[in-house]
């Protein structure tokens, strides 16, 4: 962790702010910077610098999380490009990116269905059972 770098006072302030809001400091650290992680009242685990962190127990879970993040990014970019195509009245662009968006949505639905069939749900915006 170290308290000597630039912005370390801001990090300490953010950590104190999290604790004043009822967050609990965990015995786990952020893989990116080694800072302690905090569990919010909502159950989310956050790094004071990076925000929300997903904790995984295996390499397979890590791959699943990585794939989910990639698909989310593809969805975001596709939606942005659809909007751009609409603004430019470019039917070809809209059609192309709607296809990408539909494929990403289909992949997510299949992945969610297969995980629910296994009895576990992981990831952002879904409850753990």
Swiss-Prot record:
It comes from the Archaea. Signal peptide: none annotated. Coiled coil: none annotated. It holds the Pfam family Auto_anti-p27. Belongs to the UPF0148 family. NCBIfam families: PRK00420.1-4 (NF001647). This is UPF0148 protein APE_0207.
């Amino acid at each position: 962790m170290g308290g000597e770098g630039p912005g370390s006072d801001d990090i300490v302030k953010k950590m104190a702010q999290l604790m004043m809001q009822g967050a609990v400091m965990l015995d786990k650290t952020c893989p990116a910077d080694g800072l302690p992680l905090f569990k919010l009242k909502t159950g989310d685990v956050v790094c004071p610098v990076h925000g929300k962190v997903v904790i995984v127990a295996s390499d397979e879970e890590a791959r699943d999380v990585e794939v989910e993040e990639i698909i989310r990014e593809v969805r975001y970019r596709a939606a942005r490009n659809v909007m751009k195509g609409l603004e430019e009245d470019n039917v070809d662009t809209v059609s192309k990116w709607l296809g990408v968006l539909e494929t990403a949505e289909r992949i997510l639905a299949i992945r969610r269905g297969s995980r629910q069939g296994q009895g576990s749900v992981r990831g952002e915006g879904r409850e753990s059972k």
